[in-house]
From Swiss-Prot:
It comes from Mus musculus. The keyword Cell membrane applies. The chain crosses the membrane at residues 68-94, 144-171. Its main location: membrane. One of its GO terms (molecular function) is inward rectifier potassium channel activity. Residues 95-117, 135-143 are extracellular. Keywords: Cell membrane, Ion channel, Ion transport, Membrane, Phosphoprotein, Potassium, Potassium transport, Transmembrane, Transmembrane helix, Transport, Voltage-gated channel. It catalyses: K(+)(in) = K(+)(out). The modification Phosphoserine is found at S358, S374, S376. Inward rectifier potassium channels are characterized by a greater tendency to allow potassium to flow into the cell rather than out of it. Their voltage dependence is regulated by the concentration of extracellular potassium; as external potassium is raised, the voltage range of the channel opening shifts to more positive voltages. The inward rectification is mainly due to the blockage of outward current by internal magnesium. KCNJ16 may be involved in the regulation of fluid and pH balance. It comes from the Eukaryota. Pfam families: IRK, IRK_C. A motif (Selectivity filter) lies at residues 131-136. This is Inward rectifier potassium channel 16.
Length: 419
């Protein structure tokens, strides 16, 4: 069982790398990395000692109610009604007490009929705000203060209903629930694609009503620590091949690791040891509501598999296309050099220069059949891992011409065979 579990068995083509290097696990234990984004898209950020925290929440009370949790929402919903009933019930009881209605004197016309205790005043307040109207208790024309209190309670009840019910409906229709149906692959992969080293991950929408259009964005967040122990974070955008997508079927997002990529100089070992996080966001519009949504996820080095590619999930049938969701997370090991994209470009440039200079050295062609050697992908990998090689003399270079030609041919065939 490998470091990533039994579902992702690691197989390399070079015997000196029997599995993922142990420094991958050692580096992970050495540093307790805390990610900025969890896999579900929630931010791992805690704010403390915010200036004017409660004041800012109360100014935008509607957004505060929408963002709060459902259990807190239920408590606020219940307390808003119960407290308003108690407050206005107390006011009606004070009016009755001041007017002498609690004495039950038949010569006194009460402000509110049949209110002779606090319980009766509370029930009258509840009936007024909820417009139940049993008819046993009612306000009279004797006290203008009681009439004004009924008017204020009716207005306040409309305001409470607007905020509480509106916030509850907005919370149920929030975009976060729709974002949970957008799924990112748990692992990101690095492998060869069209002859280039690429970083890939997969996005899928598993609802019947698919998104209309969407934009994918990726950023590399690198953590660094200065001499004083202060942590700094630097963001850099990753250029994507397919950033504008229609998510009808699962799509593999591709980032070519070229000279503009922050991963350009990182080989397999460097990726395992580095301290970075890849933040991916998907902003899209739903076809059922027409509202904008956003889904997020992230990948850290231990969630990046080197030398893998995703399984195909799309099957072509006679009348429709079939998506096999069981293969969404599946990947298979493929050939990928252990060196960085920078070293690959350097080696490709050297081989291209060798091809250009080979016609001018016809004396070397007569010696092509004298030396026959077997080549494998290990030779390509080994040559990529040592970009700084000694310069050969013209005589030795002529002798190595068959080897270099075979190496060039094998390198291109190996890359094309993965497509």
């Amino acid at each position: 069982m490998s470091y990533y579990g039994s579902s992702y068995r690691i197989v390399n083509v070079d015997s000196k790398y029997p599995g993922y290097p142990p420094e991958h696990a050692i580096a992970e234990k050495r540093r307790a990395r805390r990610r900025l984004l969890h896999k579900d898209g929630s931010c791992n950020v805690y704010f403390k000692h915010i200036f004017g925290e409660w004041g800012s929440y109360m100014v935008d009370i509607f957004t505060t109610l929408v963002d709060t949790k459902w259990r807190h929402m239920f408590v606020i919903f219940s307390l808003s009604y119960i407290l308003s009933w108690l407050i206005f019930g107390s006011i009606f009881w004070l009016i009755a007490f001041h007017h002498g209605d609690l004495l039950s004197d038949p010569d006194i016309t009460p402000c509110v009929d049949n209110v002779h205790s606090f319980t009766a005043a509370f029930l009258f307040s509840l009936e007024t705000q909820t417009t139940i109207g049993y008819g046993y208790r009612c306000v009279t024309e004797e006290c203008s203060v009681a009439v004004l209190t009924v008017i204020l309670q009716s207005i306040l009840s409309c305001i409470i209903n607007t905020f509480i019910i509106g916030a509850a409906l907005a919370k149920m229709a929030t975009a976060r629930k729709r974002a949970q149906t957008i799924r990112f692959s748990y692992f990101a992969l690095i492998g060869m694609r069209d002859g280039k080293l690429c970083l890939m991950w997969r996005i899928g929408d598993f609802r019947p009503n698919h998104v209309v259009e969407g934009t994918v964005r990726a950023q590399l967040l690198r953590y660094s620590e200065d001499s004083e122990g202060r942590m700094t974070m630097a963001f850099k955008d990753l250029k994507l091949v397919n950033d504008q997508i229609i998510l009808v079927t699962p799509v593999t997002i591709v980032h070519e690791i070229d000279h503009e990529s922050p991963l350009y100089a990182l080989d397999r070992k460097a990726v395992a040891k580095d301290n970075f996080e890849i933040l991916v966001t998907f902003i899209y519009t739903g076809d059922s509501t027409g509202t904008s949504h956003q889904s997020r996820s992230s990948y850290i080095p231990r969630e990046i598999l080197w030398g893998h590619r995703f399984h195909d999930v799309l099957e072509v049938k006679r009348k429709y296309y079939k998506v096999n969701c069981l293969q969404f997370e599946g990947s298979v090991e493929v050939y990928a050099p252990f060196c960085s994209a920078k070293q690959l470009d350097w080696k490709d440039q050297q081989l291209n220069n060798l091809e250009k200079t080979s016609p001018a050295r016809g004396s070397c062609n007569s010696d092509t059949n004298t030396r026959r050697r077997s080549f494998s992908a290990v030779a390509v990998v080994s040559s990529c891992e040592n970009p700084e090689e000694t310069v050969l003399s013209p005589q030795d270079e002529c002798k190595e011409m068959p080897y270099q030609k075979a190496l060039l041919t094998l390198n291109r065939i190996s890359m094309e065979s993965q497509m």
